[in-house]
Design a protein with these regions (language model features):
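Short, conserved micro-motifs composed of acidic
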Residues: 55, 185-199
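Flexible loop residues that form catalytic
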Residues: 44, 185, 206
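His/Asp/Glu-enriched short active-site or ligand-binding loop at hydrolase and phosphoryl-transfer sites
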Residues: 177-185
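Conserved small/polar residues in nucleotide/adenosyl-binding loops
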Residues: 200-207
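Short phosphate/oxyanion-binding micro-motifs
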Residues: 1-142, 150, 155-177
Length: 207
């Protein structure tokens, strides 16, 4: 069994809908190829009754947060290799975020997986962090599709970031959160957006 003292890999992917069986199979194959300890998905577009359709060998433990319609939706998948003990799950009724608190070999871990709305993303995340602050601790990972760029290095166009995004950055700083990617790659201009399904080409903000 893997522990936090071992190498812990986490991947995140906006799947833009998983109701199509071919799409689910492609996502399943991608996850198996990446072989992460934890996988966070955004825009699953599941309703509660649809979640049974996501089955991936090796990742039997899946936590969903779904809205009432086929939009938004987030999920956290835990590898069978990980001895994970859940403690608390907080789900957004609109399917825009999920908080999972648990432990791996008695070491606490909190994951906040976010799919922010296309409009007003920075303000939404800022308000969300205040709303769920009591669940966050010094072993918290915040990830997902923020629908914004936190830095001008995170976007292909070099326009200045908005005042709402600057306010969000201030909140993250005040809460002592660190942008792991930007810390490890301070000057990188890589992007993680892909244009459609799982074969994508167009660069866009690193969300």
């Amino acid at each position: 069994m893997m522990t936090l003292n071992s190498y812990l890999s986490i991947v995140t992917l906006n799947v833009n809908g998983l109701n199509d069986p071919i799409k689910r199979r492609r996502v399943s194959d991608w996850i198996k190829k990446q072989d992460p300890s934890i996988c966070c998905l955004q825009e699953t577009h599941f309703r509660q009754k649809d979640t049974y359709s996501l089955k991936i060998k090796g990742w039997r433990t899946i936590y969903h947060s779904n809205g009432p319609q086929k939009k938004a939706g987030v999920a956290i998948l835990i590898s069978d290799k990980l001895k994970f003990t859940p403690k608390t799950v907080v789900r957004d009724e609109e399917g825009h975020y999920i908080i999972l608190k648990g432990s791996i070999q008695q070491e606490d871990l909190t994951i906040l997986n976010i799919y922010a709305p296309n409009v007003g993303a920075a303000k939404y995340i800022n308000q969300l962090l205040t709303k769920v602050k009591k669940y966050l601790d010094n072993n918290t990972l915040i990830l997902g599709d923020f629908n914004l760029a936190l830095s001008i290095l995170d976007r292909s166009s070099k326009h200045n970031i908005s005042k709402e995004t600057r306010a969000l950055n201030d909140t993250l700083d005040q809460m002592d959160f660190t942008d792991i990617y930007r810390t490890l790659h301070p000057n990188s201009t890589e992007y993680t957006f892909f244009s459609s399904c799982l074969l994508y080409t167009s660069p866009s903000p690193r969300d």
